[in-house]
Amino acid sequence: MPAVKIGIIGAGSAVFSLRLVSDLCKTPGLSGSTVTLMDIDEERLDAVLTIAKKYVEEVGADLKFEKTTSVDEAIADADFVINTAMVGGHTYLEKVRRISEKYGYYRGIDAQEFNMVSDYYTFSNYNQLKYFVDIARKIERLSPKAWYSAAANPVFEGTTLVTRTVPIKAVGFCHGHYGVMEIIEKLGLERKQVDWQVAGVNHGIWLNRFRYNGEDAYPLLPRWISEKSKDWKPENPFNDQLSPAAIDMYKFYGVMPIGDTVRNASWRYHRDLETKKRWYGEPWGGADSEIGWKWYQDTLGKVTDITKKVAKFIKENPALKLSDLGSVLGKDLSEKQFVLEVEKILDPEKKSGEQHISFHDALLNDNRSRFVINIPNKGIIQGIDDDVVVEVPAVVDRDGIHPEKIDPPLPERVVKYYLRPRIMRMEMALEAFLTGDIRIIKEVLYRDPRTKSDEQVEKVIEEILSLPENEEMRKNYLKK
């Protein structure tokens, strides 16, 4: 059983990092491994490290920890590098969004047809794209045999960029495919009897195969829609898998959009707050409305505060067990949710649902498993270029990644009317980044239904480029 080094970049993301640590503890084949936690926010990093060590101590696992603020130290001699970092954080994203809305671009210039997710910036996110390439080049130099796992958005643009420009082993991960499980549950099906397959691009995947006990299960959907969809209400802003938007997309494309694909719809569903509420449900209007996104940001802030609070309490009370947190934390909903998350990771029988550690285990220890991953197409999906990264199921073992045959193929409408337009915007974002041709970003906005004049385009781009953190971006785009 090989002990490995796993570097986690952006490890101050508490819940994500703790999920990975818990999965490592539940993976015997990776026992004895070293986890290097890297983040530029030392306070958050220390808090995560404290809780992670406490967890490992309680479950009796053999894991070693290192912490660092240096990307190089996280990467050096690593076998796997997981990147979840967002350059500039949500503060930068909101700066760009405010400037964009000042000039008439509701929810920001990066909110585009088929890319409405609020932290999935592609055109104003030069620093994030550059960070992806910088990390990949450091891996090439410091740990050329390591696998790079992309978890930070934009996964589609980022993983395509890295696989095209740096010769390392790279793969992207997302949670979106778990939307299939909600459909299975709502239809009252036994999960083990369902044969499903999804395919597309990150945040643009579709349920191409849906069979139950060997029979086509799609006929069950219209019945649910006619009998129960009228009673649907979202439990939180992200609960949209069976929303009116999802059902409307299904009726047009012929297959169900899965996970974040429901959010990444056309402007028909996103024109304004009232439109969003109609398609994604009251009271939030989905995760990407101004209300839904504030809910998400507030939740993130609370989780950060709770993480620090728990870490402080552990240091002051070393005899405390994580299983006792329920008696320590208050009755606030966010604290209750944090306790539930801890209870999940303490369950020795269940992994977190994050795919990274199981993927590594499959490669190292030949524990053959099925994943939904982001890899270069290379003929997997018909009608898409080979060097475009697609999100598809694959079996992974010691011999590598074995993509499944997409059967049945995606409907032509999905490929022609959804995937190709989304891919076009990805190509425009990457060409703009790589060439420094600002005209490409302008062209995107000239085509934008929110644009009323060329002057509007010039002003919004100029103000975004003038942000202090965008000095390098400005030099890149104004060098010609």
Curated annotation (Swiss-Prot):
Annotated control of activity: Inhibited by EDTA in vitro.
Family matches, as SUPFAM superfamilies: LDH C-terminal domain-like (SSF56327), NAD(P)-binding Rossmann-fold domains (SSF51735)
Binding residues annotated for Mn(2+), in chain numbering: 174, 203
Cofactor note (record): Binds 1 NAD(+) per subunit. Binds 1 Mn(2+) ion per subunit.
GO molecular function ontology, one term from the record: oxidoreductase activity, acting on the CH-OH group of donors, NAD or NADP as acceptor
Record-listed NAD(+) binding positions: 4-70
InterPro entries reported for this sequence: Alpha-glycosidase, GH4_Enzyme_sf, Glyco_hydro_4, Glyco_hydro_4_C, Lactate_DH/Glyco_Ohase_4_C, NAD(P)-bd_dom_sf
Enzyme active site: 175, 260
Cofactor: NAD(+); Mn(2+)
Positions annotated to bind substrate: 119, 153
CDD domains according to UniProt: GH4_alpha_glucosidase_galactosidase (cd05297)
Enzyme Commission number, as recorded: 3.2.1.20
Hydrolase is among the record's keywords: yes
PANTHER family the UniProt entry points to: 6-PHOSPHO-BETA-GLUCOSIDASE-RELATED (PTHR32092), ALPHA-GLUCOSIDASE (PTHR32092:SF4)
Protein function: Is able to hydrolyze diverse types of alpha-glycoside bonds in di- and trisaccharides: alpha-1,4 bonds of maltose and maltotriose, alpha-1,1 bonds of trehalose, alpha-1,2 bonds of sucrose, alpha-1,3 bonds of turanose and melizitose, alpha-1,6 bonds of isomaltose and melibiose. Acts on the substrate from the non-reducing end of the chain. The activity of AglA drops with increasing length of the saccharide chain.
Protein name: Alpha-glucosidase
Source organism of the structure: Thermotoga neapolitana
Organism taxonomic ancestry: Bacteria, Thermotogati, Thermotogota, Thermotogae, Thermotogales
Originating gene: aglA
